[in-house]
Each structure stands twice: as structure tokens, then as C-alpha cells.
Swiss-Prot record:
Disulfide bonds: none annotated. The gene is kup1. Residues 1-21 are annotated as: Disordered. Residues 1-16 have a biased composition (Polar residues). This is Probable potassium transport system protein Kup 1. One of its GO terms (molecular function) is symporter activity. It comes from Mesorhizobium japonicum (strain LMG 29417 / CECT 9101 / MAFF 303099) (Mesorhizobium loti (strain MAFF 303099)). It is a multi-pass membrane protein.
């Protein structure tokens, strides 16, 4: 991936000696990016222009100035937020090729000598807001597409919500089988979708080419001046046109910057502009009657195929968001912002294709509750913008840290860009926050719940670590005493998993206390997560000899990797340790937590932390340790 001189830590990529192969690969990735990256923003024309016009006209007939003003706002929002902010700047802030708010947080946080708690807090908020968006996108996308049947026949109205629930149930049910096979058709279907919406808009632009005057920003100024109070509310609806822009950055690691940029500039951006302009021309031709312009401008035989295609496109958009939620959750787990959760790999070739049963179930329940509770896409639209605008504002703040501390840009350049982007983000956020009582509370409630859970887990883990360290014996002290006065030694190797390699693990102390024996070779093993997506094998293992009985081993994994302890320990052979899984026993401590008024956290937070800990996946399965080689020792800890 080619990078400008931004000072990024990304390693240079060797140029291919076969340009025709590289060109073919780029085209394939572009096609894939259409289905995964642009599914969300690509389905926004179904409802964005309509909702903006309804807001500007109070549900009555829209005036010519309103139509041109709304269209101009959409055009320039797509240009500034997506093309300039994300395409030109944010996509360059990759963390070893990976993107997303947690990747950006890890990159920014790593630039501080001591990992900044403030940056961690900003990252938690950003991730939580993403989940607020992730539950609304499938609901509003599929619901708005199915509502297209009302244009075909109004008698379909009673079946809109039930059919939407059936489609969503199928989407969530098939997650366990993976998206490898289905994913092959995502790109082509989405390509047909963009071509179809572009052509449907072009037809009406040709009929009324004067609509293209909306490209002039003076219509925005006139719209804002004429009715500032109405314009303020309308801006919140305008933002629906750019929801999904954050997916460009979130999926950076899957496709790379070049295919994402080329797909936007050559296909997505032009087709979106054509469709929005076509909707504007269509409403002008109807003398300002809003209705449902996206579907209504596809007259005659084209209407039903467009409804079917829209439904397929919204399902693909939903799939992209669900996959993104799985990926973000895995990153949060690896960065110790959430407890270990069960992760199932659905592809032998692509490590990024994963399925998380609990996350999938929670998403399905919340999405379906939103569909039933709101009932119409127009009502859901009020709930949509808050979490996305908040996420974009978080990205702007973290981008400023990267520009100043990692890229080493001049301060005035970084401040100028940050002020511009933040001004737009805050403007959109402010216009959306007024919709809290109209439905915006839904996404905020989801985000707040995630923030509370992550904050409790991070805080509780810190308290538990500190308390455990205070009560444990330093490893070096214990190892020295055991060397002087050896207990009975048994053959083989014992590996003790611990989060604190400087202290004697609880499992080791219980083994000495109850069994009075020690293995000939004892390994104190800790697993840490680096602030980068992938760690090369050369940096995977760090070994340190304590004495002839004990050795300290640290395994390092990237936040996008699934820890595999046996495979990582095999690397130790190159460093002199003849690791043999068949003569090795793994000792794990299983803690039973009890709430204590002296933990430093409120009792309710103690109980929440304990509840989260109980949901954690089994360490044996999570670290992929053979079950026949594991010994678990239970302990009770009051926090």
C-alpha cells in the first residue's frame, strides 16, 4: 500500500514485478470492497434524501430552494467528509495496515511513553458508538428496502415488519456458517446495485439538467439563512447520506487503501451523486411532493426489480456491519477491554472471518427489538445519526494525536484540519442530539451500555491485578528459596499461565502447598497483546532464565490475532528450549470472584465485573491448549 510522507509506521511494501497480476488483484479487491465497505453508505439513498426533504418541509410540499439546498448539502457532505476527510487523510492513519477506531486508538496510545488513560477512554467511547450504529444499520436498511413494496401496493403495509424480521432472522442465523461462499456474490450484486441507482438517477437528470446547479454551495448558504431553525434540524437528516463512511477505515485491513479509494472515486461516489441528483429532479418534476422518491422514480417494470435489488443490497450492508462488530469485539477482547469471548473461525484461509455466538445473539435481539419498537424506517432515522457522528468525532480527535505525535506534522496544519473536521462533526452531532427523545436514545443507550461494560472490565481487571500482586510472593524470591531447598522433583515440564510474570502464580503456590512436588522444568508463561494488528514470529517469544528450575516466557500477539499457545511455544525450540507438548502440563488458575466493599469500586460495579468475568470463554479453548494437558486449580478472590 503506497503511503504519502506521513511518517506512518507502516512498513514499505515491495513493488510487484508483475504489474498485470497486481492490477487484476486490485480489481478483485475493488469488487470485494463494493460489497463490504460500501454496502452501508450505498443503501443510504433509499431513505436519506426523503428524510431530509421531510425535515425541511415539515412533511408538506418541498419548495425549490429546499430541494436544491438539501441536494447541495448532501453533495458537499459526501465530498468533504468522505472524499477529503476519510479518503485523503484518515485512510493514511493505518496501524500496520489495519484500520478502525480501536486500531487508531492503539496507534495513538502507543505514541505516549506511558499508555494514556485518556486515549483509552476515547477509544472505549468510539468503540461503543460503533456498536450503537451496528444495531441500527441492519434494522433501518432492511426495513426501508421492504417498505418499497408499499409503493408497489399499499396493501402490503401489514407485512412490512414481519417480513423484515424474517429476513433479519435468516441473516443472523447463517452467520455461524461464515460468509466465505456468499461473500463471493456480495461484490457483483453491489456493483449491479450502484449501476442501477446511478442509471435511475441519470434518467431524471437528463429530463431536468438544471438540477445540477445544486453543486453550487451558494444554495447551502441560502438554505441556512432562509430558515436557520429548520436547516439545523434538516442537517441531522442530511447526515444519513454519509452514514457508513467510517466503514472505509474500519475495513482498511481487509482490502487496503488503494482498492477502497479507487472503488469510491470510480464507482460509488459518481453513482451516489447521480442518484441523489436524480431524486432531486424527480421531486422538482412532481412540484415538490416528497413521497418516496427513490422507489417512485423507478416507474413501470423497473419498480419491483429495484425493490428486490434494494433488499439484497441492504442485507449485504447488514452483513458488513455484523462482520465489523465481530472484528471490533475481537480487537476489544485482545486489548483487554472486554472479557474473553468465544471466537469460532469460519474459514481455513481467512483468519478475519470469524463468528462470535454471544455477540451475534445480542445483536439479533437488539436489532429485532428496534424493528418492532419503531416499526418504520422514518422513525428509526431519528435514532441513526447520533452514534455515527460521535464515532466520527472520536476519529477526528485520535487523528489529531497521530498527525502531531507520529506523523510529526506542523502544528498549524494539524490544528487547521482538526478544526475543520471537528466543526463539521460537531455540527452534525448537535443537529442529531436534539432527536434524543424522538429515537436517538436507542443508539445512546446501546453505546452507554457498552461504555459501562468496557469501563468496568478495564477498571476491575486493574484492581484485581493490583490486589493479586500484593498477596503473591515475588517469583525471583520463591525460585531462589526452592533452589536452596528443593522439594521432590518430578519429570516433565509445567507451564503456569499468569498475567503477572513477576509474581509466583497462584496455581504454582497451590501445587507446592498441596502436592509437595515441583517439575524439573517450570515455565512462568504470560500472554500480552501488542498495540499492532499482527506480530511477526521473530518477535513472538521472549525467554528469560530465572534459575535452573524456572524460566519466564512472554508470548506477544497482535490485537487481530487469535492466541495459539502451543504453536507459539514451538518457536522456543529455535531459542534452545526443547518444547514437547506431550510431556508438558499446563496449570491454570480458575478464580471465583466475590464482591467486597473494600475493592475501590462501588458494589454494583463489583457485581457487574463478576458477571462479565463469568461470561468469559474457557482459557483452555481460547488459548487453544490441548484439554488433556491442562490442570485447573480453583481459587476464591474477593474484589
Amino acid at each position: 500500500m503506497a503511503l504519502a510522507n506521513t511518517g506512518s509506521e507502516a512498513e514499505p511494501v515491495e513493488q510487484s514485478s508483475h504489474p498485470e497480476i497486481e492490477q487484476h488483484s486490485t480489481k478483485v479487491l475493488m469488487l470485494g470492497a463494493l460489497g463490504v465497505v460500501y454496502g452501508d453508505i450505498g443503501t443510504s439513498p433509499i431513505y436519506a434524501f426523503r428524510e431530509a426533504l421531510v425535515a425541511s418541509s415539515h412533511g408538506t410540499v418541498a419548495q425549490r430552494g429546499d430541494i436544491l439546498g438539501v441536494l447541495s448539502l448532501i453533495i458537499w457532505s459526501l465530498t468533504i467528509i468522505v472524499t477529503i476527510k476519510y479518503i485523503m487523510f484518515v485512510l493514511r492513519a493505518d496501524n500496520r495496515g489495519e484500520g478502525g477506531v480501536l486500531s487508531l486508538m492503539a496507534l495513538a496510545r502507543g505514541s505516549f511513553p506511558k499508555r494514556s488513560a485518556v486515549i483509552l477512554g476515547i477509544g472505549i467511547v468510539g468503540a461503543s458508538l460503533f456498536f450503537g450504529d451496528a444495531v441500527i444499520t441492519p434494522a433501518i436498511s432492511v426495513l426501508s428496502a421492504v417498505e418499497g413494496m408499499n409503493v408497489v401496493t399499499p396493501t402490503f403495509q401489514p407485512y412490512v415488519v414481519p417480513l423484515t424480521l424474517v429476513i433479519l432472522a435468516v441473516v443472523f442465523a447463517v452467520q455461524r456458517f461464515g460468509t466465505g461462499g456468499v461473500g463471493l456474490v456480495f461484490g457483483p450484486v453491489t456493483a449491479v446495485w450502484f449501476l442501477a441507482i446511478g442509471l435511475s438517477g441519470l434518467k431524471h437528470i437528463i429530463a431536468d439538467p438544471e438540477i445540477l446547479w445544486a453543486i453550487s454551495p451558494h444554495y447551502i448558504v441560502a438554505f441556512l439563512i432562509h430558515s436557520p431553525d429548520v436547516a439545523f434540524v434538516t442537517i441531522g437528516a442530511i447526515f444519513l447520506a454519509v452514514t457508513g463512511a467510517e466503514a472505509l477505515y474500519a475495513d482498511l485491513g481487509h482490502f487496503g487503501r488503494k482498492p477502497i479509494v479507487l472503488a469510491w472515486l470510480s464507482i460509488v461516489f459518481p453513482c451516489l451523486l447521480l442518484n441523489y441528483a436524480g431524486q432531486g429532479a424527480f421531486v422538482l418534476a412532481k412540484n415538490g411532493v416528497v413521497g418516496h422518491p427513490f422507489f417512485e422514480m423507478n416507474e413501470g417494470w423497473a419498480l419491483i426489480p429495484m425493490v428486490v435489488l434494494a433488499t439484497a443490497a441492504t442485507v449485504i450492508a447488514s452483513q458488513a456491519v455484523i462482520s465489523g462488530a465481530f472484528s471490533l469485539t475481537r480487537q476489544a477482547v485482545q486489548l483487554n477491554m472486554l472479557p474473553r469471548l468465544e471466537i469460532l473461525h469460519t474459514s481455513e484461509k481467512q483468519s478475519g472471518q470469524i463468528y462470535m455466538p454471544r455477540v451475534n445473539l445480542l445483536l439479533a435481539l437488539v436489532v429485532m427489538m428496534l424493528v418492532v419498537g419503531f416499526g418504520e424506517s422514518s422513525k428509526l432515522a431519528s435514532a441513526y445519526g447520533i452514534s455515527v457522528t460521535g464515532n466520527m468525532l472520536v476519529t477526528t480527535v485520535l487523528l489529531y494525536v497521530v498527525m502531531t505525535r507520529i506523523w510529526k506534522w506542523r502544528l498549524w496544519v494539524a490544528i487547521s484540519l482538526t478544526v475543520l473536521f471537528a466543526f463539521i462533526d460537531i455540527g452534525f452531532f448537535a443537529s442529531n442530539i436534539v432527536k434524543v427523545f424522538e429515537g436517538g436514545w436507542a443508539s445512546l443507550l446501546v453505546a452507554f451500555t457498552i461504555v459501562l461494560g468496557m469501563w468496568t472490565w478495564v477498571r476491575g481487571s486493574r484492581y484485581l491485578f493490583d490486589k493479586t500482586r500484593r498477596n503473591e510472593i515475588p517469583l525471583d524470591f520463591l525460585a531462589g528459596n526452592l533452589l536452596k531447598k528443593k522439594p521432590q522433583l518430578v519429570s516433565g515440564t509445567a507451564v503456569f499461565l499468569t498475567s503477572d510474570p513477576l509474581s509466583a502464580p497462584t496455581a504454582l503456590m497451590h501445587s507446592l502447598k498441596h502436592y509437595k512436588v515441583l517439575h524439573e522444568q517450570n515455565v512462568i508463561l504470560s500472554v500480552v497483546t501488542a498495540p499492532q494488528p499482527v506480530v511477526p514470529d521473530s518477535d513472538r517469544v521472549k525467554m528469560e532464565t530465572v534459575n535452573e528450575l524456572f524460566m519466564r516466557v512472554t508470548l506477544t500477539f497482535g490485537y487481530m490475532e487469535q492466541p495459539n499457545i502451543p504453536r507459539a511455544l514451538a518457536i522456543c525450540r529455535k531459542q534452545g528450549w526443547k518444547f514437547d507438548i506431550m510431556t508438558t502440563s499446563f496449570f491454570l488458575s480458575r478464580r471465583s470472584l466475590k464482591a467486597s466493599p473494600n475493592s475501590g469500586m462501588p458494589v454494583w460495579q463489583d457485581r457487574l465485573f463478576i458477571g462479565l468475568a463469568r461470561t468469559a470463554a474457557d482459557a483452555t479453548e481460547y488459548f487453544q491448549i490441548p484439554t488433556g494437558r491442562v490442570v485447573e486449580i480453583g481459587t476464591q478472590v474477593a474484589i
